[in-house]
Curated annotation (Swiss-Prot):
Cofactor remark: Binds 1 FAD per subunit in a bicovalent manner.
Active site: 484
TM segment ranges: none
Name of protein: Cannabidiolic acid synthase-like 1
Length: 545
């Protein structure tokens, strides 16, 4: 009996030693173990395609930085991935998930790299980036008016290929052509057609998602709850989106636009803004009228640097010049819109015009510019967003605009963007994005700058603006938009047992009453919280399952 007990103890000790040794080896060499695991997912017939980049690879930094759109996150101290995977197909995504789980690495998934807080390519723990640049096909079915869009496609590529197949079809998504479809669609995604057709996420009819077990799911196999969650609730919370099936929408053969600049004192400008905020959301959905204000540094007659504000009122109208001018003169005569202020453009040229890649006086638009994934000049930036449910008083509006003159602004911009139209008709719970009826407009606060040593100064400026506007925007909670992610709203401490309580603070700002349903979906499909970040949807603790 004694011998048996001793032998059992001795054998257990040996087993424990080898298990501990293997665990230590695994922990000590997560990159090596990941690569060994992942090698089985690399096809033997692919010789020229580069799928894997490690920190010793000569192209590692160029691949990493190529789609980092916010230069705040390119410093030497920014956490870097152990490995970057650029999958060619879904099997490589499956392999990355399974191997990352096996060796204890986190995953960040990057489509276009526009995450405002860099969370598609930054983690505070050892991690792998899945960079979807190679998965960017857009397959159009004109007959059914649908398309399959791989998650690595940019909005520019989506618009280009739809237009190539049919000039009277498009898709309701954002303005910036280098934004990736993977993240944009899964966070909501709004743009020029929002008041006509809703968000990008409102027009998704199927998806391919790779889940925590490495299985590829479509709408039928994932079920309606998970399909609901990934359309506005952040697909990265539940897996990796490989592709979306989207519903295409009708657009006019020609649209009419104007973008008029107003040079006037702020007190006079605010009178126009006040009129705008009371009528823009009430227009018929065929008219989008928005306004924005941007700082410009100029040199005055004495050679001194001076900050000035350029103010613009801009439109997209589904109709002709005469109809637009007549409508504006009746409803907003203070703007003084004339025929000479207007341009008639095809829909694809309208997209290019407002993409920011051409100037106002351009007379010829080459749509191939939408295929350029480089994004042009980049800068460091910070962005916040608010929803406005009642008119901001003129005195407060004066102070808000005057903040653009403050020393620490860098290049500052405020955009006032109207809601209304079909957005008033869609239920708050139709998808996780809850911002619908009752919202007059949203405000974007943006600061951009060149030097990384100025980061804190400019970030503090935008925080001060945000704090000032607190009494004038949505309340209880102060709502926010997932695609303009803001870590100032809160972060989850994964060591804390109160993940849900922490996440609820910011979760209800992004998702309102939909947050709890997202938590239930997360608990069901990823109970161990493998897909996580500082603002991910948490699963409920085991006792609450």
């Amino acid at each position: 009996m004694k011998c048996s007990t001793f032998c059992f103890w001795y054998v257990c000790k040996i087993i424990f030693f080898f298990l501990s040794f293997n665990i230590q080896i695994s922990i000590a060499n997560p990159q090596e173990n990941f690569l060994k695991c992942f090698s089985q997912y690399i096809p033997t017939n692919v010789t020229n395609a580069k799928l894997v980049y490690t920190q010793h690879d000569q192209f590692y930094m160029s691949i990493l930085n190529s789609t980092i759109q916010n230069l705040r996150f390119t410093s030497d101290t920014t956490p870097k991935p152990l490995v970057i995977i650029t999958p060619l197909n879904v099997s490589h995504i499956q392999g990355t998930i399974l191997c990352s789980k096996k060796v204890g690495l986190q995953i960040r998934t990057r489509s276009g790299g526009h995450d405002a807080e860099g969370m598609s390519y930054i983690s505070q723990v050892p991690f792998v980036i899945v960079d979807l640049r190679n998965m960017h096909s857009v397959k159009i079915d004109v007959h059914s008016q649908t398309a399959w869009v791989e998650a690595g496609a940019t909005l520019g590529e989506v618009y280009y290929w739809i237009n190539e197949n049919n000039e009277n079809l498009s898709f309701p998504a954002g303005y910036c052509p280098t934004v990736g479809a993977g993240g944009h669609f899964s966070g909501g995604g709004y743009g020029a057609l929002m008041r006509n057709y809703g968000l990008a996420a409102d027009n998704i009819i199927d998806a391919h998602l790779v889940n925590v077990d490495g299985k590829v799911l479509d709408r039928k196999s994932m079920g309606e709850d998970l399909f609901w969650a990934i359309r506005g609730g952040g697909g990265e919370n539940f897996g990796i989106i490989a592709a979306w099936k989207i519903r295409l929408v009708a657009v006019p053969s020609m649209s009419t636009i104007f973008s008029v600049k107003k040079n006037m004192e702020i007190h006079e400008l605010v009178k126009l803004v006040n009129k705008w905020q009371n009528i823009a959301y009430m227009y018929e959905k065929e008219l989008l009228l928005f306004t924005h204000f941007i700082t410009r540094n100029i040199t005055d007659n004495q050679g001194k640097n001076k900050t000035t504000i350029h103010s613009y009122f801009s439109s997209i109208f589904h109709g002709g010049v005469d109809s637009l001018v007549d409508l504006m003169n009746k409803s907003f005569p203070e703007l003084g819109i004339k025929k000479t202020d207007c341009k008639q453009l095809s829909w694809i040229d309208t997209i290019i015009f407002y993409s920011g890649v051409v100037n106002y006086n351009t007379t010829y638009f080459k749509k191939e510019i939408l295929l350029d994934r480089s994004g042009g000049r980049k800068a460091a930036f910070s962005i916040k967003l608010d929803y406005v449910k009642k008119p901001i008083p003129e005195t407060a509006m004066v102070t808000i605009l005057e903040k653009l003159y403050e020393e620490d602004v860098g290049v500052g911009m405020f955009v006032f963007y109207p809601y209304g139209g079909i957005m008033d008709e869609i239920s708050e719970s139709a998808i996780p994005f809850p911002h619908r009826a009752g919202i007059m407009y949203e405000i974007w606060y943006i600061a951009s700058w060149e030097k990384q040593e100025d980061n804190e100064k400019h970030i503090n400026w935008i925080r001060n603006v945000y704090n000032f506007t607190t009494p004038y925007v949505s309340q209880n909670p102060r709502m926010a938009y997932l695609n303009y992610r803001d870590l100032d709203l809160g972060k989850t401490n994964f060591e804390s047992p109160n993940n849900y309580t922490q996440a609820r603070i910011w979760g209800e700002k992004y998702f309102g009453k939909n947050f709890n349903r997202l938590v239930k979906v997360k608990t069901k499909v990823d109970p161990d919280n493998f897909f996580r970040n500082e603002q991910s949807i948490p699963p409920l603790p085991l006792r609450h399952h």
